[in-house]
Amino acid sequence: MSKLKYFFPDSQDFIDPSFDFVRETRNEHRVRQRDDHYPHEVFPHPYDGMLVSKAVVDGLGGGESKYTRAQRLRYFRNGMKHFFRLPDNMQTMGDCGAFTYVNQDVPPYRVEEVIEFYETSRFNYGVSLDHIIFGYEKPGESFSGEVLAECRRRQDITLTLAQDFLVKSQKSCFTPFGVAHGWNKKSYRQSVEALLAMGYKNITMGGMVPLKTAQILETLEEIKPLLKSDTQVHLLGIARPESFADFIRLGVTSIDSTTPLQQAFKDRKNNYHTPEGRAYTAVRVPQFDANPSLSRKIKSGVIDQDVARHLEKDAMHALFEYDNNALSLEKTLEAVLAYERLHSGEKEAEKIRADYERTLGDRPWRKCECNICRSIGINVIIFRGAERNRRRGFHNIQVLYNRLQYTLSLRSEDKS
């Protein structure tokens, strides 16, 4: 792997190309996943590869998988690249999805099961079986007692499993990565030292998702002297575009994160990302008959169904008219906020007014050249249903990757 690559983690997020944004219907013969599109089928190059977790495909022990039985059979029969229809130039990585079993006493898998999953998937890279450590020491803080004992227990489990994984995967098709865990920069360093002593040439830094950027950077600074020129370092679950240059400087060679996708529909305000690092709030127009909160209010008689249907229709019509330059910003905002007051209340509507006005006034979708924004226009900033929300997430993924490429281009110019 060359510096710095972005892997997109699979979380069963895809879009239906048959979806009609006016009628809000789809092809009745559509087969989920098989007929849908991943980001790499929408954009020429939104990432360098994909990461798949065993926990997502297989579930936890006897637990529920995110894949249907038919999907799992297809996945294992054809391998990951064929299942995801990945182009030849994209790489593949597998991990265990340790955050899904963080509350268990020990990981729910055996090393042999993990290796079998990686080989059947035909990954390029495989991450050793690990166990998340809770917490990271704050400045002036020092873990002790049972908390420290549990941190050390989980670190020991991870390192023992890493040793076993390295030995048993020697003849496998994938390149092994050993996972480092810690509760401060020193303990992370100890993990990395142990992994390198075992013979690992590639390191993944695990458990960093909850950490502040400063904590991540101080840890990377701590381990940098240990890294050789050919040591590969992967940050599990981390993107942080504002720190791309620092990551590269500190020896990181690859990252993975679903944050750009998740923020499209889980963040309160930062839903639509731009290359400059600014973010916009998507305009919420929930389907009155498909939104659980709204449905409850209608069923309980708090909201009149006919009024809800009328205001929802008015809001959507106003947004489409605005995108066609047939309605003013003021009248569009008025229609949107009328529905907002109904489903979120007067107080919330007033709080969100300025954000909506900024989104609609700036029209960021018109300035974007990505395939999503060009094809669906204002729909990309409407917070409504999975098809719109995921497309906004796909846009965010492409923005992240473009920001990464821009950072890399600046470094190339500096070196020349």
From Swiss-Prot:
Keywords: Glycosyltransferase, Metal-binding, Transferase, Zinc. Its cofactor is Zn(2+). It comes from the Bacteria. Binds 1 zinc ion per subunit. It is an enzyme of class 2 (transferase). SUPFAM superfamilies: tRNA-guanine transglycosylase (SSF51713). Its EC number is 2.4.2.-. Part of the dpd cluster involved in the insertion of 7-deazaguanine derivatives in DNA. DpdA may insert 7-cyano-7-deazaguanine (preQ0) into DNA with the help of DpdB. DpdA and dpdB are necessary and sufficient to synthesize 2'-deoxy-7-cyano-7-deazaguanosine (dPreQ0). This is DNA-guanine transglycosylase. The lineage of its organism: Bacteria, Pseudomonadati, Pseudomonadota, Gammaproteobacteria, Enterobacterales. The gene is dpdA.
